[in-house]
Amino acid sequence: AGVGLQDRALFQERVDYTLTNQSEGDFHDQQLTNTSFAGAVGRGADFSGANLHGAIFTQGAFAEADFHGADLSDSLMDRADFTRTDLRDALLIGVIASGSSFAGADVEGADFSDALLDRDDQRRLCQVAEGVNPSTGVATRDSLNC
């Protein structure tokens, strides 16, 4: 019963990036499921192709970061700065992103199905939304309920 040694070892290896500066950091193609970047600064960081399922980005600053093709599903992204980020082909299914800024973000092919976004953000994203997510086959405009 309880947590196995292997599970404990995996948990101990998980890195917590809360309140750290990861600007220009290289996280591409990494397995970062459930990792916390809460309050972190990740301006210009490379998260392309990373598995960030269930990650926490609350109150973080990720302007101009690259999330191209990343899995951000079920992530907490509330009150965070995603200004001018590359979210092309990203999975944002079920994210909670209330109070966040996506101004100037490239969302071509991103899947926002069941995402919680501020109404103003949703309207702005709909103005530039295009493409179809290559993994889910869902059109970005449809996922945003445009």
Feature-to-residue mapping (PLM):
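Tandem repeat scaffolds
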Residues: 2-145
